[in-house]
Regions:
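Predominantly a Rossmann-like dinucleotide-binding segment in NAD(P)-dependent oxidoreductases
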Residues: 84-157, 164
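NAD(P)-binding Rossmann-fold cofactor-contacting core
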Residues: 1-7
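Rossmann-fold dehydrogenase core element
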Residues: 65-83, 104-108
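Beta-loop-alpha module in the N-terminal Rossmann-like domain of NAD(P)-dependent dehydrogenases
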Residues: 7-70
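Hydrophobic residues in well-ordered beta-strands that form the structural core
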Residues: 13, 53-54, 78-80, 208
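C-terminal helix-rich "cap/oligomerization" subdomain common to oxidoreductases
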Residues: 5, 27-32, 178, 230, ...
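Contiguous beta-strand/loop segments that form the cofactor/metal-binding neighborhood of enzyme cores
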Residues: 143-216, 243-254
Length: 259
């Protein structure tokens, strides 16, 4: 109650069930650990609530497929709070690629690493909390790749270094789709890396730093060597962009749904 009073929160619930069944609630934002998403999402859908859920949306495709079907049956929208799909810079870069100035996308390279102290009880390294590099940070890289590839990858090679708990502490991925576009990903929870994404094309390349919440990118053209800096949006407004897209998706704009 003290927290609610401090931040002027008008309604407080004594249980999750009380919130899920409240007829005045239209949308629920789920921000709990990964391993709880499926259960909470299912409960929300059955109570006719639209859902925005933090990444990773579920632990596997079977869970997600079931929930998508259930959402369609109950006429509700589910969306993943994956910043890559909602930050304005990505739509702007997509327009540049669609213009043809850079030519075909050939290769995408991704890095994301943070140094987490070995604490086997926290969510990063705890199997019971769906820990590991892929579910925590790898989903950003894969979403970036999917945004810029012409089709989803259908070939995958991977190498994993496990943490003492068995979750993936480090991972390397090599992906390719039917168009021959390739992508490489290096992830780590125990080694700091820059959050860098690069899209290499026939006539130049795009480089994006801090790509999970990017607001700026550089576009370099091979023939002239010129580099153009592109800006759009603000880092601190990332959640607002997600909410705006969620509202538009509920209103019927399917282009704002990225599942």
């Amino acid at each position: 109650m003290a927290f609610a009073e401090k931040y002027n929160i008008g309604k407080v619930y004594d249980s999750y069930d009380e919130m899920f069944t409240d007829p005045d609630v239209d949308i629920i934002y789920i921000t709990t650990p990964h391993n709880t998403h499926y259960g909470f999402m299912k409960k929300a859908i059955l109570n006719k609530k639209h859902i925005l859920v933090e990444k990773s949306i579920t632990l596997n495709s079977d869970e997600l497929g079931e929930l998508i079907a259930l959402a369609e049956e109950n006429n509700v929208v589910i969306g993943e709070a994956m910043t890559v799909y909602h930050m304005p810079i990505y739509s702007k870069l997509r327009e540049i690629l669609d213009s043809g100035k850079l030519g075909k996308v050939n290769l995408i390279t991704m890095n994301f690493g943070s140094f987490k102290e070995y604490d086997m009880n926290n969510r990063f390294f705890n199997r019971n909390l769906a820990g590991g590099a892929m579910l925590d940070i790898g989903v950003y890289a894969l979403s970036f790749i999917r945004w810029f590839m012409d089709s989803k990858p259908d070939q995958l090679l991977s190498q994993v270094k496990p943490a003492p708990t068995g979750v993936d502490e480090q991972a390397g991925l090599l992906l390719m789709n039917k168009e021959g576009q390739m992508a490489t990903v290096m992830l780590s929870l125990h080694s700091k890396q820059p959050k860098r994404g690069m899209v290499s094309c026939e006539n130049g390349y795009i480089e994006i730093m801090e790509y999970p919440r990017a607001w700026e990118a550089s576009v370099t053209y091979t023939e002239t060597g010129d580099t153009e800096v592109i800006t759009a949006g603000k880092n601190e407004d990332a959640l607002a962009y997600e909410l705006e897209d969620m509202e538009q998706a509920i209103a019927g704009d399917e282009s704002k749904m990225h599942l």
